[in-house]
A protein has these predicted regions:
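Amphipathic alpha-helical packing segments from all-alpha helical-bundle domains
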Residues: 63-66, 92, 112-138, 145-149, ...
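Amphipathic C-terminal alpha-helical segment
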Residues: 92-95, 102, 131, 141-142, ...
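Hydrophobic alpha-helical connector segments
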Residues: 56, 70-98, 147-151
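Helix-turn-helix
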Residues: 6, 10, 14, 18-52, ...
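Short, structured helix-loop boundary elements
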Residues: 8-9, 29, 51, 55, ...
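Anionic, Ser/Thr-rich low-complexity intrinsically disordered regions
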Residues: 40-42, 61, 65, 73-75, ...
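N-terminal intrinsically disordered/low-complexity leader segments
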Residues: 1-6, 17, 188-196
Length: 196
C-alpha cells in the first residue's frame, strides 16, 4: 500500500477511535485534527468534513455486513447457514467493535440524505439476512420487516454484550447462536426449522 494510502487509513482509524471514545458530537474539528496528527486547516485536505468521515465509517460497516451474507452457503441447510452467518458476524464484531458502536450511537449525527443511504443499506441487509436464514417464514409485511430488524439487531449487538463475559469464547458464541436460533424459531413461524 502506498504511504499516502497508509497514512489516510491510519488517520481514519485514529478518528474512529476518538469518535467511539467521546461520541461524534463531542469531538471538535480542532481536537480531531490534533488527534490524527494534522493541523485544523489541513484536515480538510484529507477529509471533506467530519460528517463525511463518520458516514464513510458507517457505510463501510454496512458493506462488510452485506458481505457476511454472501450466497456461497446457500446450498447448505438453514441451520448451517445460520451458524455461518452468526460466526461471520461474531468475527466482524471482533474486528470492528468501534464501528458497530458508531453505527448504533452516532447514526443520528449524519445528514438526512446520509441517514437515508444507510437506512437503505440496512434494509437491504435485513432482507438478505432473512432470505438466507428463514426463507420459508409465514410472516409477511410489517411483521416480517419487524422480525428482520430484531434479528439483525441481535446479530449486531450480542457480540458486544457478551464480550465482557468470563465465559470462554466458544461458550459465548454458542450462547449467541442458541439465543438467535430460539428467537428465529419462535419469532418466524416455519422459518429456520423447516427451511432447507
Amino acid at each position: 500500500m502506498p504511504r499516502t494510502c497508509a497514512d489516510y487509513e491510519e488517520r481514519r482509524d485514529k478518528a474512529l477511535e476518538l469518535f467511539a471514545l467521546k461520541g461524534f458530537g463531542q469531538v471538535s474539528m480542532r481536537e480531531l485534527a490534533a488527534h490524527v496528527g494534522l493541523t485544523a486547516g489541513s484536515l480538510y485536505h484529507h477529509f471533506p468534513s467530519k460528517q463525511h468521515l463518520l458516514f464513510d465509517l458507517i457505510e463501510e460497516l454496512y458493506e462488510e455486513l452485506l458481505a457476511t451474507l454472501h450466497p456461497s452457503g446457500r446450498g447448505r441447510d438453514a441451520t448451517a447457514r445460520l451458524s455461518a452467518v452468526i460466526r461471520a458476524h461474531w468475527e466482524l464484531h471482533a474486528e470492528r467493535p468501534l464501528q458497530f458502536r458508531l453505527a448504533e450511537r452516532d447514526l443520528c449525527c449524519l445528514s438526512e440524505e446520509q441517514q437515508a443511504q444507510i437506512a437503505g443499506m440496512r434494509q437491504d441487509y435485513e432482507q438478505r439476512l432473512l432470505a438466507l436464514i428463514a426463507p420459508t417464514s409465514r410472516l409477511s409485511g410489517p411483521a416480517l420487516q419487524a422480525s428482520a430488524q430484531v434479528v439483525a439487531s441481535l446479530l449486531n449487538s450480542l457480540p458486544g454484550w457478551l464480550q465482557n463475559s468470563a465465559a470462554p469464547e466458544a461458550q459465548r458464541l454458542a450462547l449467541m447462536e442458541s439465543m438467535l436460533r430460539g428467537a428465529i424459531e419462535r419469532g418466524l413461524p416455519a422459518g429456520i426449522s423447516s427451511a432447507a
